[in-house]
């Protein structure tokens, strides 16, 4: 299917058709819509190689994730990746997943960047002090950080206010009378983990609550289960528990249910960041910190990346969303 056939049908020039499909601003919106509609009707697909030679772009984005903390068992992460990929596909852009050791001196994604096989990077699970961000900025490589950039560099980033998430949840529990609130926190140095931990600590300190019950655990059901079983064996177990991720939260809920402490007269209040996974066997409406829908997040991230590869200033792309607290049925006054 050629541009000439589309041009003949619409009664316009081949040049106009080409520029309309290329997204040039000198083509009227109404004309572009007619051209795009006719192209879709005919099943027209542009010559990708020719377009890449013309624009100098590869139409590919790399998403870098930590190889030592593989997030593929996280439904939250995989849902986000799926949505980003789907949204970028609307622009005929492919998403490549790149495993990388964030602490290494030589990063795997640099080979793709230097060989011009990708147009930009998305850096997932940023560190609180991330040398990759500094390196990419100095090298002039377009990227979007999923997490705020504490170095203060003029970089593009998208983040949730993770501090506010756990702070809100802890404040709600304190308002109900809880004084012993445990946190199951991921045993990593990712920026979002540290922010969630600090939000919990700050809320406790604001009310003069000391000796916090902090357990550093891997983000797995098993780790959450074992940590809660240990906490509930203490002489003075916590009256409330917050988990900073969904998988350890599911394990925590299973442990409490097994102990008969998820509901009833001796129930322990439970809040799970991101809510329980979709495949959880827990039937209660567990309290959660909600970070918007996966589709909205994917759309936001893909839109920011699209702006980056089309020349938008990184400083203009620094966005933070605030999560909300959902009380569910597992938050209540202390029962013991």
From Swiss-Prot:
Signal peptide: none annotated. GO terms for molecular function: DNA-binding transcription factor activity; transcription cis-regulatory region binding. CDD domains: HTH_LacI, PBP1_AglR-like. SMART domains: HTH_LACI. Pfam families: LacI, Peripla_BP_1. Keywords: DNA-binding, Plasmid, Repressor, Transcription, Transcription regulation. Residues 3-22 bind DNA. The keyword Nuclease does not apply. Residues 2-55 form the HTH lacI-type domain. Homodimer. Repressor that negatively controls the expression of the raffinose (raf) operon by binding to the raf operator (rafO) DNA. Acts by binding to two operator sites, O1 and 02, which flank the -35 raf promoter box. RafR bound to 02 alone results in 45 % repression of transcription, whereas RafR bound to O1 leads to only 6% repression. This is HTH-type transcriptional regulator RafR.
